[in-house]
Design a protein with these regions (language model features):
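Bacterial N-terminal signal peptides
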Residues: 6-17
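Extracellular/periplasmic metallocenter environments
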Residues: 23-34, 80-118
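N-terminal edge beta-strand
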Residues: 26-50
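Short, solvent-exposed loop/turn positions at domain surfaces
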Residues: 39-40, 73, 85
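Beta-strand cores of secreted/periplasmic/IMS beta-sandwich domains, seen most often
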Residues: 43-61, 85-101
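Short, surface-exposed beta-strand/strand-loop-strand elements in extracellular ectodomains
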Residues: 64-70
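Surface-exposed loop/edge segments in extracytoplasmic proteins
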Residues: 71-78
Length: 118
């Protein structure tokens, strides 16, 4: 009997964990990122939780997208002219995140920014 109850409890806990993961994935915020000549624009201020960044290169120069904060760093591949990429990050409330393009001297020419997840 004890083995059956333990097995049942383990099944319930596993199902609850899977439901939480599925809910988290379905409620991910989407932020569109437009990279052009020495400029990066975010469509919205990212909030805490799972955020999917959809990045589009709107210029004829190569660009990538880096995001750092909370002890983590995420990056996309370099996109060619009119290329797209995406990355998904889990942002922590109250943490400052910085983002930039690391291609050549793009960051020092203004392709950077920051936000606090609130």
């Amino acid at each position: 009997m004890k083995l059956i109850l333990t097995s049942l409890l383990a099944t319930i806990v596993a199902a609850a964990s899977l439901a939480a993961v599925a809910k988290s994935a379905s409620t991910a915020q989407t932020v569109r990122v437009i990279e052009s000549s020495y400029s990066i624009r975010l469509s919205a201020k990212p909030k805490p939780g799972t955020v999917k960044f959809l990045v589009r290169n709107a210029s004829d120069d190569g660009h990538d997208f880096w995001l750092r904060g909370g002890g983590r760093t995420w990056k996309t591949r370099v996109m060619g002219e009119t290329g797209t990429a995406s990355l998904t990050a889990v942002l922590k409330r109250g943490v400052k995140y910085t983002y930039w393009c690391a291609v050549g001297s793009h960051r020092s020419k203004g392709m950077s920014g920051s936000f606090v997840a609130r």
